[in-house]
């Protein structure tokens, strides 16, 4: 069985000097290795090919055969690591909470323990007949977030 930690080390060492960063390494049955990358500017195919070749040069296919797939996370893929959150500041997000509620708004700040979203709520001012849009800041604890994706 291919060691996930070995792949993480190889990828992390390779990416340590650039803007591209590791999001996830998954090893599926049949030694199918999936490596997901991301970057503020996006990940080009040349970076994926170069990293794939680097991994193949470090992991001996003769000892144990494997299938390797290196790619970028999609624009609408869920956010998984802190650097992805940081790259999404000032972007619109859809955040699904663990209680089933969904919040949509512009990401203002992010910290390891919580995020702050700017959301628009329809509020009825006192004495008014209709609701009017009102911008509010909403703090959401990371532990309460089930999934968050960018809105394009």
Swiss-Prot record:
One of its GO terms (biological process) is translation. Keywords: Cytoplasm, Ribosome biogenesis. Its main location: cytoplasm. The keyword Methyltransferase does not apply. It is found in: Cytoplasm. GO terms for cellular component: cytosol. Transmembrane segments: none annotated. NCBIfam families: PRK02001.1. HAMAP family: RimP. Required for maturation of 30S ribosomal subunits. Belongs to the RimP family. This is Ribosome maturation factor RimP. It comes from Porphyromonas gingivalis (strain ATCC 33277 / DSM 20709 / CIP 103683 / JCM 12257 / NCTC 11834 / 2561).
